[in-house]
């Protein structure tokens, strides 16, 4: 059974808004710096999920743009994750405290030095380089990235 989710990177032109996941117990992302996002709710489109999750986790009203889709086979036991990757450059509002971790604007040149999933380095670079729409698969064994496949669409 697949799990559908979104991950959103909010870009202010010189920094990405990152979430340091350090507040939720038993969090598969504990200690990592990631974008904001979450699981799709029943009947929700990926776009609706991205807008909702951004508002819930950051307090920002945003216009997310879908940049790609990543499959994570068996990312959690017996569950494949299909994650819609969004980039946001249009947003308004003030940041709120997030119950999942600490939000921080991270300069582009520091983003890849933060502790994160190994594969995140790859697709965050694609977002920063404004690569075309992508479909990718990242295969992990625990924290170790075993394989990456990607197709870009012009």
Swiss-Prot record:
Q: Does the keyword DNA repair apply?
A: yes
Keywords, alphabetical? DNA damage, DNA repair, DNA replication, Hydrolase, Magnesium, Metal-binding, Mutator protein
**Motif Nudix box: where in chain:** 38-59
- Where does the source fall among the domains of life? Bacteria
The record lists the catalysed reaction(s) as: 8-oxo-dGTP + H2O = 8-oxo-dGMP + diphosphate + H(+)
**Coiled-coil boundaries:** none
Could you give the subunit structure recorded for this chain?
Answer: Homotrimer.
Task: Supply the name of the protein.
Answer: 8-oxo-dGTP diphosphatase
Q: Which organism is it from?
A: Streptococcus pneumoniae (strain ATCC BAA-255 / R6)
